[in-house]
Design a protein with these regions (language model features):
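Regulatory N- and C-terminal appendages and interdomain linkers associated
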Residues: 1-50, 57-66, 147
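Conserved ATP-binding subdomain of kinase catalytic cores across diverse folds
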Residues: 38-175
């Protein structure tokens, strides 16, 4: 029997959501011209959501520009229990990236500390069936996708744990 190919749905990626991300990122003068989805994860990466990139053409002050966002798109699960679990996970991640971390980083700036290293979230939609996060594409700053099959070396694991420790300590600033 042939393997069934599942084509991911990008219906949550819309002009309105991309324009909202563009405005948050580049300012109110940025106007969306066009966009296209370009996958950069491989089959078998086993993410709880669809992770892809959106290449955006826009104008700002009369000049043409291009930028790329990482889109995390909620999956449409057919099994009710999985649907509930994945939705709860997505909502938690969205609130963390879209609300909590920006507040923590604002406090960190005010007290003269380095921000928590995390991709900026430019647009977060948590409406059921329309879940999407449009985030900074860290590949522009030379970050690369981590190969989970190979494991992490000690230097990178140390960096991750140090940043996680900073996040844990900084979370008290919101009390």
């Amino acid at each position: 029997m042939a393997e069934e190919t599942v084509i991911p749905s990008y219906s949550q990626v819309t002009d309105e959501k991309i324009q909202a991300a563009l405005t948050a990122d580049k300012g109110p003068g940025a106007k969306l011209v066009s966009w296209q989805v370009k996958d950069f994860t491989k089959k078998g990466d086993n993410y709880a959501c669809i992770v892809t990139s959106v290449i955006v053409q826009y104008t700002l002050e009369g000049a043409q520009h291009e930028t790329t966002y990482v889109a995390k798109i909620g999956r449409d699960m057919q099994v009710a229990s999985l649907k509930t679990m994945f939705r709860q996970m997505f909502v938690r991640e969205g609130k963390c990236l879209g609300e909590i971390l920006p507040r923590i980083n604002e406090v960190m700036r005010k007290i003269g500390r380095r921000e928590i290293s995390v991709a900026k979230c430019f647009h977060c939609c948590l409406d059921e069936g329309k879940e999407i996060l449009l985030m900074e594409d860290l590949r522009a700053r030379s970050f690369r996708m981590f190969d989970r099959q190979r494991g992490m070396d000690a230097a990178h694991a140390t960096l991750v744990l140090q940043e996680l420790g900073r996040l844990h300590a900084a979370s008290i600033l919101l009390d």
